[in-house]
Amino acid sequence: MQFTALAEQPVVAVGFGLTVLLFVGDLAALGYWARKEAAARDRSVVRTLWYLLTGVGAVHYAFVRFIRRDPGSRDAPPGPRERLAAAYTVAVVLAFLAGAVVSPPDPVTQVLAFPPLFAVAFAAMALLVTREPLAEESNAPT
């Protein structure tokens, strides 16, 4: 598909633009998340960034840190911005994987499906990383 065809099909152009913006935002959120995590653990930002750049590393870390609530060796608990940056990064990975499974193998369709899939994944991840852990909920008196 040529770039001149994007001007003829505004829906594809908007979908392509949103997808590019989401991926650029993911890089910014990933950098912020890596910097905050490395500072809280007194570790190298580069090593943390490389770990989080792998999709498996980001999903694993978000699960351990925010869903299981494993405190690890941090100086302070993660703040709300760090939690949302993690949710954004993991939502991009999940939306990409869901798009590969759900949408047809046509690249244009996958680009058009990415923004709505991201919105759903981000909402789900934001709810997961901002809620209280399940262990505390089960200890609450009834």
Predicted regions and their residues:
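Hydrophobic alpha-helical membrane-associated segments
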Residues: L22-L30, A124
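Hydrophobic, aromatic-rich membrane-embedded alpha-helical segments
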Residues: R47-D70, P107-Q110
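Hydrophobic alpha-helical transmembrane segments of multi-pass membrane proteins
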Residues: V14-G25, P115
